[in-house]
């Protein structure tokens, strides 16, 4: 046995040393296979031969610019501008790669010989001879073809097969291959062509006028054009000469003449129009007709060449919806027509529309211009004294760095020489991380003198302006204005400053002042400003009488007080509301009371917008007498209704539901409408020129919902008719090949100008020869639509709802009583069921078909219910008792049965709530069961802009029943359902894991041949559905269409790369998509989205957790778990399994590459190699540069490989590097701060936020410095410390500004991969002598005790000497069902960033707690300018402020500073829980709280490099805080635990045992595995590569709990 163990160990060591030949051979084989795979992948790329002779640098440029190709460089042909010429072939191939192979392509100005050699018979080259060079170039191409053919003939070869078709075409029909007309006049007509047409323009777009380009493309029916051209951003400056260095070319500009040439070559120049090229660069839209435009989009920039594409856009696809309420209906519809035409004009015909109006777009497409500004340079002639000016591009950061610094110069120091000296120094100085560096600004040194003069002139003018501004303010006796402010101050008391500031900000008052005469010129112009030429003008500040505004403000203040009870009152725009109340003469107080009543739904009326905006509330409350003619009336009044038959006789049918110019009470049941045929030939204006909804709905909520439903039908009908009229008006410019949702029939020719996708439309819109438009009932014969003589055209729509909307409106108007809907008294029960709970099955089991009625939204669902009900062979379900909702409403009253006992509505929540109320009323039932799912897709308002308020969407019911057991969904989907539903969702399915996802390379990958999809195919959008159907997939539906359906297997596909709003974590569409299958679902997507994250989370679930959701006969047994474990953590003992390899695997997955770093000799390498250090002022004792040799005991060697470093040896170099990276590398970010006043305000906020109200004032009767406090401090000290105080007489203090410096021997491990690229500096310790600590230690211990006793411990935790159990108790009352934002503030260089302001804040906190003034001043001076001495390393230096890491206040001081920092930036009054420890913080806020720009505030006020993170789980002091529905559990970071197992400082076995015990103490919570799944989520949130880690957590528990087993993690270093 011993021999076997010895042999195993020896083999293992041989493998580690690389002596195992088998392992070495396997590694070589793996390396060889990888290399072969990589070369094979490269061989599959398109091959391009580069024959021109170019340099190695140019070879690298070409290779990097075009990674899509495998380029072979032959270097066999010398030529002029060889790189540019060779790149031209690459550019051509790149453009052709964008085009589908075989599609007809026009090459504008192209090389037809290149296409012949590639065998592209589908390309037509347009090669006009604009000058003699073009003729010469074309002849050269013909010569290359003849040379190629003669070479084949001489060798007895024939043209290869792939070229044969192209050469035959060129030989037989040369005009099909190439023509010599311009692209605008080209008349090439393809013989037979199907599919889309494309075009490319390689360096030829310059010669086509931009205004003619769109029309030329449309004449050739081009779908997309790809173009490439040379350009430089510098052409947009005032430069007349611009170099293109990479291709050795240049642009020269003279007015509008732009010349392109190659440097140092005698080739001819190319001349173009600068303004024409600028249009191609800056414009977005290129009009082609009054309907279509070509929209430009930049693709990429490669080697001074810009690539872009022009896409054909049909502006008729812009949707025109009708859902607005106007005072004058005729004016509204006229204005709507004008607005739509104006919108179309903007999209097509505005030739000055500029793409780069957005600065973010400028930065993206002009990357060299990002953060660059254009600065003027000035010069003067000595002979003529004439001043000259030019412009250069300079980094904006560089400009403000210089200006901010030289602005601090005193008047005498502000000289040109000093400015130039500073500019030259920051351009040349080298600093990186305090050690080595180079300048971050690459400014041309030849420009430094001119730039310095510009900076100097600007600063001198700015200083003069400031002096004049200050002189304008009176500093003597009080002015009249000041006396007014004093009187206001007396009235408001202490609140005056904030009131004054509020009034100034609101512009209700203004401060008078004289106009200033000095204007400092703009220092720079941004690149974006130069493009769009935007300028702003200054406005003087006039005087203003504030008395009237103060009275108005008082009125608005009272109104604001009334509005303060609203949830979002802070978002109400008071200025807009005030203006509207004033113009309409509405009392603001009355308006405020109405707003509160409407928002709380207690008023009995509803405004038809989503929330009452300021203007609409004032308009709704306008006095009736002041209203204009035709304005809506809130109160009901009797109005005589016009005759319906008379309206139809005139062709003007009134069909405005409950809307229009009449109140709802004026409508009554009208027996005149007997048939829908009476609507035939009603004018379209009568349908689309009526108001679509009332401003105010009155009555109970059900009545309001029913009124809104009628108005929604009117709006839908109006929108459909309006769109058909628009199609008839714009038919002339419609492209016949474009797929449309409409159809237009030309009556004279009996042909469809636009062929509809469907047939036999019942209704349409007719255009007569008199250009009048009517709604018509269509009839058909054997020739098609039956038409009349005066008809010109007929428009139909595949999505038209004219017939159904008219029929439903006819039915609902009959049901109105005196203009009001009748509400049934039947009991309404909502059955809320999870997906797959068997809602349809339950309906069939409960229904009595002889007396009950079933209604469903869709025809397929109705047929499915009839089929299932009649499956036994007995026909019980017929079209009389199982109907669709539309059929029931349209045919109401025609059936033999008109009354039912019970009504069952399946998927009722997909209907408008008013529709449901009407169905209950129309069925005359006693009880109605509405089956639905509150979390799935609700009713969607399809009419754009139609108001459907949020409280209308909630169905009013008498009782709610829940169904929480799914018969369909597998266990993993059931786990997801538990997040979305209240209560416990269980499943009867035996399938545990069913979901998966696959990221595809692009939409083109999805096709039936290479990617057959299994099961039912679903998409989220109609566009994706149409794309899949067009590619050959069958039976494809959207998620919305299959709600309520069940399938065994589902393939869910997303082809749209742009963001889709319905794909979100809480989207009902995602819920429906995940719950349609019983066995499997696979999600194919082209982008990462929230659904991918959800599926990945479900894939990581462990099987034992999924077993908890399985139930056989109900949910009662599962529901008992909550009452048993409420208020305490569920405990499940962790199994002790796993091996060392599990820990190593987990560490390598989380931190890849760290374990491979051989860092044992990093410290030796640093001491033996040359090093350059940038050191601040300090004194070095070079005699300490060589450390004395010490006998080192070899530590134990860990078996787990981590990034842990070997212990470092103290020495001059090591300590100096640590001091440079720590103490000398403090950031300087803060702005100008009034330290004392700001510190006082911050401390006020600190006390108000964290301390109990009754303990905010210190107890002055308690002495801080007493014998008891000294004894408490001594009890915590070691005997060695007490011995150092034996000779201290406590009469006088040692120097409090003298500190000692040392380093920790063991570097701190970082849980990232930075160890692979940098040498980690040691942590420094700066500390006082024990004599000083003996004075201040007891004091601050007592102050700390008082502070912690005063903190509101129910909401805040100051983590000092707390156990993990206490942390769990503190966070244990968090309600996991309440949405929360978990915030963490991450601050880098926390200790070293603290400056005078931090010292003032901390001192003010201790002072208010009772710190004695004299000792407080001593303590403050001891932390101001301090001297550091490192006797071991021989270093002495001076630093200002900074947190001393070995000070008595290090920990508590850091804690109160982080708490004060957060209190000054975040709304602590809203916080749920907060914890602070040193520089760590963890905050829980209610979901949706608005937070300021924390990074900005932390930089300017606190000098912190801070980032605020929102998390799902908290991370605090190396522990994950997992809150759940029963409390909270705190897990020690498992990755940090594994990192410690790789420690290389363990001396011996006794030390190892102490190490194990300490790890056991901190990791005790890992013994509970009940919440390992949540721990996985928390770890993955920090480390995105972390796999599910339950296996490694169990392994850690196994080794930590066994003393003997733990020793196997290390081997004795002395035996190696």
Swiss-Prot record:
Residues of the (+)RNA virus helicase ATP-binding domain: 801-963
Protein name (database record): Replicase large subunit
Region (Methyltransferase): 50-458
GO molecular function: ATP binding; ATP hydrolysis activity; mRNA methyltransferase activity; RNA binding; RNA helicase activity; RNA-directed RNA polymerase activity
Domain (+)RNA virus helicase C-terminal stretches: 964-1116
UniProt GO BP: DNA-templated transcription; mRNA modification; RNA processing; symbiont-mediated suppression of host innate immune response; viral RNA genome replication
Assembly description: Heterodimer of a large and a small subunit.
Helicase: annotated segments: 830-1085
Binding residues for ATP: 833-840
Keywords, ordered alphabetically: ATP-binding, Helicase, Host-virus interaction, Hydrolase, Inhibition of host innate immune response by virus, Nucleotide-binding, Nucleotidyltransferase, RNA suppression of termination, RNA-directed RNA polymerase, Suppressor of RNA silencing, Transferase, Viral immunoevasion, Viral RNA replication
């Amino acid at each position: 046995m011993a021999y076997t163990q010895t042999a195993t160990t020896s083999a293992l060591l041989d493998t580690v040393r690389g002596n195992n030949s088998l392992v070495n051979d396997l590694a070589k084989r793996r390396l060889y296979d990888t290399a072969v795979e990589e070369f094979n992948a490269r061989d599959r790329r398109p091959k391009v031969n580069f024959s021109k002779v170019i340099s190695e640098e140019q070879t690298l440029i070409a290779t990097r610019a075009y990674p899509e190709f495998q380029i072979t460089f032959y270097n066999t042909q010398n030529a002029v501008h060889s790189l540019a010429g060779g790149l031209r072939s690459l550019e051509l191939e790149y453009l052709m790669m964008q085009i589908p192979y075989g599609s007809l392509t026009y090459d504008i100005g192209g090389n037809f010989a290149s296409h012949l050699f590639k065998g592209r018979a589908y390309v037509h080259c347009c090669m006009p001879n604009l000058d003699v060079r073009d003729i010469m170039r074309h002849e050269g191409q013909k010569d290359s073809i003849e040379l190629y053919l003669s070479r084949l003939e001489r060798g007895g070869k024939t043209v290869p097969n792939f070229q044969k078709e192209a050469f035959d075409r060129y030989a037989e029909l040369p005009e099909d291959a190439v023509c010599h007309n311009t692209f605008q006049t080209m008349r090439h007509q393809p013989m037979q062509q199907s599919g889309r047409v494309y075009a490319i323009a390689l360096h030829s777009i310059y010669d086509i006028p931009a205004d003619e380009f769109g029309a030329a493309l449309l004449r050739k029916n081009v779908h997309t054009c790809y173009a490439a051209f040379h350009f430089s951003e510098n052409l947009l400056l005032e430069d007349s000469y611009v170099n293109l260095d990479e291709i050795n070319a240049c642009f020269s500009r003279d007015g509008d003449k732009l010349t392109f040439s190659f440097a140092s070559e005698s080739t001819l120049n190319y001349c173009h129009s600068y303004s024409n090229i600028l249009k191609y660069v800056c414009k977005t839209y290129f009009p082609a007709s009054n309907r279509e435009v070509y929209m430009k989009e930049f693709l990429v920039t490669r080697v001074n060449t810009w690539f872009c594409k022009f896409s054909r856009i049909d502006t008729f696809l812009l949707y025109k919806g009708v859902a607005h309420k106007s005072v004058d209906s005729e004016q509204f519809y006229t204005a709507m027509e004008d607005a739509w035409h104006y919108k179309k004009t903007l999209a097509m015909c505005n030739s000055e529309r500029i793409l780069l109006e957005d600065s973010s777009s400028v930065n993206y497409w002009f990357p060299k211009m990002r953060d660059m500004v254009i600065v003027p340079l000035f010069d003067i002639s000595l002979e003529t004294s004439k001043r000259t000016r030019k412009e250069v591009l300079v980094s904006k950061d560089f400009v403000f760095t210089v200006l901010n610094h030289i602005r601090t110069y005193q008047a005498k120091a502000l000289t040109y020489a000093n400015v130039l000296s500073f500019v030259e120094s920051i351009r040349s100085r080298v600093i990186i991380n305090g050690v080595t560096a180079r300048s971050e600004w690459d400014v041309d040194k030849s420009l430094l003198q001119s730039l310095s003069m510009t900076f100097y002139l600007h600063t001198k003018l700015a200083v003069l302006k400031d002096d004049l501004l200050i002189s304008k303010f009176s500093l003597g006796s009080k002015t009249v204005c000041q006396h007014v402010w004093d009187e206001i101050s007396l009235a408001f008391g202490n609140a005056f400053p904030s009131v004054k500031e509020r009034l100034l900000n609101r512009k209700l008052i203004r401060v008078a002042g004289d106009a200033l005469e000095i204007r400092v010129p703009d220092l720079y112009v941004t690149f974006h400003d130069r493009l769009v030429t935007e300028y702003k003008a200054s406005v003087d500040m006039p005087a203003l009488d504030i008395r009237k505004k103060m009275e108005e403000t008082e009125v608005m203040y009272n109104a604001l007080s009334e509005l303060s009870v609203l949830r979002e009152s802070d978002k109400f725009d008071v200025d807009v509301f005030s203006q509207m109340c004033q113009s309409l003469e509405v009392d603001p107080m009355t308006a405020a009371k109405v707003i509160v009543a409407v928002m709380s739904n207690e008023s009995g009326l509803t405004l038809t917008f989503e929330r009452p905006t300021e203007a609409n509330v004032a308009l709704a409350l306008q006095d009736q007498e002041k209203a204009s003619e035709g304005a809506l009336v809130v109160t009901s009044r009797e109005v005589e209704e016009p005759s319906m038959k008379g309206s139809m006789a005139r062709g003007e049918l009134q069909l405005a539901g409950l809307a229009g110019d009449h109140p709802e009470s004026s409508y009554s049941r009208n027996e005149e409408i007997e048939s829908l045929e009476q609507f035939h030939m009603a004018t379209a204006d009568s349908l689309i020129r009526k108001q679509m909804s009332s401003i105010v709905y009155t009555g109970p909520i059900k009545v309001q919902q029913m009124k809104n439903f009628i108005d929604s039908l009117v709006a839908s009908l109006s929108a459909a008719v309006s769109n058909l009229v628009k199609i008839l008006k714009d038919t002339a410019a419609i492209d016949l090949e474009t797929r449309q949702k409409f159809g237009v029939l030309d009556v004279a020719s009996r042909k469809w100008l636009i062929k509809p996708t469907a047939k036999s439309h019942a209704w349409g819109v007719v255009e007569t020869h008199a250009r009048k438009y009517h709604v018509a009932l269509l009839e058909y014969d054997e020739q098609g639509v039956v038409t009349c003589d005066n008809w010109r055209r007929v428009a139909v729509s595949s999505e038209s709802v004219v017939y159904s909307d008219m029929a439903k409106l006819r039915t609902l108007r009959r049901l109105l009583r005196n203009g009001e809907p009748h509400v049934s008294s039947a009991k309404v029960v909502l059955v809320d069921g999870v997906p797959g709970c068997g809602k349809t099955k339950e309906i069939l089991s409960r229904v009595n078909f002889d007396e009950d009625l079933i209604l469903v939204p869709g025809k397929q669902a109705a047929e499915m219910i009839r089929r299932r009900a009649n499956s036994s062979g007995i026909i019980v379900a017929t079209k009389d008792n199982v109907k669709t909702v539309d059929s029931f409403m349209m045919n109401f009253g025609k059936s033999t049965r008109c009354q039912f006992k019970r009504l069952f509505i399946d998927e009722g929540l997909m209907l408008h709530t008013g529709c449901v109320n009407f169905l209950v009323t129309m069925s005359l039932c006693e009880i109605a069961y509405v089956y639905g799912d509150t979390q799935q897709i609700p009713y969607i308002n399809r009419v754009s802009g139609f108001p459907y308020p949020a409280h209308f969407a909630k169905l009013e019911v008498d009782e709610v029943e829940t169904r929480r057991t799914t018969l369909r969904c597998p266990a993993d989907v059931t786990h997801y359902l538990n997040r979305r539903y209240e209560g416990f969702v269980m499943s009867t399915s035996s399938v545990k894991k069913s979901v998966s996802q696959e990221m595809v390379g692009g939409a083109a990958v999805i096709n039936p041949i290479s990617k057959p999809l299994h099961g039912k195919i679903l998409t989220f959008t109609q566009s994706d559905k149409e794309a899949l159907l067009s590619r050959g997939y069958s039976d494809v539906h959207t998620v919305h269409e299959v709600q309520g359906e069940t399938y065994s297997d589902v393939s869910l596909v997303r082809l749209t790369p742009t963001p889709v709003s319905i794909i979100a974590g809480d989207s009902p569409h995602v819920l429906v998509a995940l719950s349609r299958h019983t066995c499997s679902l696979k999600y194919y997507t082209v982008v990462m989205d929230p659904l991918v994250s959800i599926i990945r989370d479900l894939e990581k679930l462990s099987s034992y957790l999924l077993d908890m959701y399985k139930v056989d006969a109900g949910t009662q047994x599962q529901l008992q778990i909550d009452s048993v474990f409420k208020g305490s953590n569920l405990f499940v003992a962790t199994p002790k399994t796993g091996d060392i390899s599990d820990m190593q695997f987990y560490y390598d997955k989380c931190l890849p590459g760290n374990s491979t770093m051989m860092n044992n000799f990093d410290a030796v390498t640093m001491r033996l190699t040359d090093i350059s250090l940038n050191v601040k002022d300090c004194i070095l004792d070079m005699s300490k540069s060589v450390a004395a040799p010490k006998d080192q005991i070899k530590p134990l060697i860990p078996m787990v490989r981590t990034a842990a470093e070997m212990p470092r040896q103290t020495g001059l170099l090591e300590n100096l590097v640590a001091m440079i990276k720590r103490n000398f590398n403090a950031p300087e970010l803060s702005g100008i701060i009034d330290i004392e006043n700001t510190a006082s305000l911050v401390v006020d906020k600190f006390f108000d936020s964290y301390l109990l109200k009754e303990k905010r004032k210190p107890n002055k009767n308690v002495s801080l410095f007493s014998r008891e406090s000294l004894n408490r401090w001594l009890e915590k000290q070691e005997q060695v410390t007490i011995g150092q105080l034996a000779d201290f007489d406590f009469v006088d203090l040692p120097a409090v500004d003298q500190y000692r410096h040392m380093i920790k021997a063991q570097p701190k491990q970082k849980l990232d991969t930075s160890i692979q690229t940098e040498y980690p500096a040691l942590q420094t310790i700066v500390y006082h002598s024990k004599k000083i600590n003996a004075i201040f230690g007891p004091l601050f211990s007592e102050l700390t005790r008082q502070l912690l006793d005063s903190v509101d411990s129910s909401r805040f935790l100051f983590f000092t000497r707390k156990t993990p159990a206490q942390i769990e108790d503190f966070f244990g009352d968090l309600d996991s069902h309440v949405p929360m934002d978990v915030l963490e503030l991450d601050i880098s260089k926390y200790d070293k960033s603290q400056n005078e302001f931090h010292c003032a804040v901390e001192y003010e906190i201790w002072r208010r707690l009772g710190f004695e003034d004299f000792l407080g001043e001593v303590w403050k001076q001891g932390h101001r300018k301090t001297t550091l001495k490192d006797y071991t390393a021989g270093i002495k230096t001076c630093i200002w402020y900074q947190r001393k890491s070995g000070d008595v206040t290090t920990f508590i001081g850091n804690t109160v500073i982080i708490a004060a920092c957060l209190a000054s930036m975040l709304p602590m009054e809203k916080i749920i829980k907060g914890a602070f420890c040193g520089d760590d913080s963890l905050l829980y806020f209610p979901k949706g709280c608005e937070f300021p720009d924390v990074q900005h505030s932390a930089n300017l006020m606190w000098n912190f490099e801070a980032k605020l993170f929102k998390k799902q789980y908290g991370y605090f002091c190396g522990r994950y805080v997992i809150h759940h529905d029963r409390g909270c559990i705190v897990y020690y970071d498992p990755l940090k635990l594994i990192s410690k197992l790789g420690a290389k400082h363990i001396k011996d076995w006794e030390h190892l045992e102490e190490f194990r015990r300490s790890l056991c103490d901190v990791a005790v919570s890992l013994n509970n595995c009940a919440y390992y799944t949540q721990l996985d989520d928390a770890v993955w949130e920090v480390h995105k590569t972390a796999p599910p880690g339950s296996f490694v957590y169990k392994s850690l528990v196994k080794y930590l709990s066994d003393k003997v087993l733990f020793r196997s993690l290390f081997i004795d270093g002395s035996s190696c």
